[in-house]
Amino acid sequence: MILLVSPKDVAEAYEAINGGADIIDVKNPPEGSLGANFPWVIKEIRSATPNGMLVSAAIGDVHYKPGTVTLAALGATISGADYIKIGLYGTRSYQEAVDVMKNVSNAVKSEDPKKIVVAAGYADAYRVGAVDPLIIPKIARDSGCDVAMLDTAVKDGKTLFDHLSIDLLKEFVEETHKYGMKCALAGSIKKEEIPMLKEIGCDIVGIRGAACTKGDRNEGKIQKDLVKEIVKICKE
């Protein structure tokens, strides 16, 4: 299982890189769960990241505005992100979500077919009125994405496991794999919860708070020693 760590700036990116993270995921926590950062921050982090190491960019907890989202996704692609990650926050149905993601996939793949498009849903979708998390694999499949992902929308200390049982998460992973895609799971995941994700076959685990001082995704800063501890668990 590989580790995605979400820095908000270049200083944190260096900590994640030196800690051994597999994917450097550019994020802007004040703007939400999958808050989008600025194009120049993506460019700076891409420049700071070694060749061969993948850079991801969150495009935001997006609303049902396919044109706006597609343009933002293309901006992240041109800025150097390898993974383009869309949080389906304001899409209320399968059809709306597919509409957004299909257009994103078309824009990103037209620019560079090797880029990886991630459809991200929310385990706590019921709290914000987002699309059902358990249909994210079908949405990703039907819109030409490469990865189906789950996170949590509300960052209040509750984790992925507070909203979905391990059995449902296992079904999510298995369905994603059945469609030939990779599965990523995140959502205020604690270090001690990571082995459960490995056990159910998750491909990518995404963290920020667990790698930050005081476990605080907003006020804390990513530390390489904390990243190293998590990398060790992922690779055991």
Curated annotation (Swiss-Prot):
Coiled coil: none annotated. SUPFAM superfamilies: Aldolase, Ribulose-phoshate binding barrel. The keyword Cytoplasm does not apply. InterPro entries: 4HFCP_synth, 4HFCP_synth_arc, RibuloseP-bd_barrel. Keywords: Lyase, Schiff base. HAMAP family: MfnB. This is (5-formylfuran-3-yl)methyl phosphate synthase. It comes from Methanococcus vannielii (strain ATCC 35089 / DSM 1224 / JCM 13029 / OCM 148 / SB).
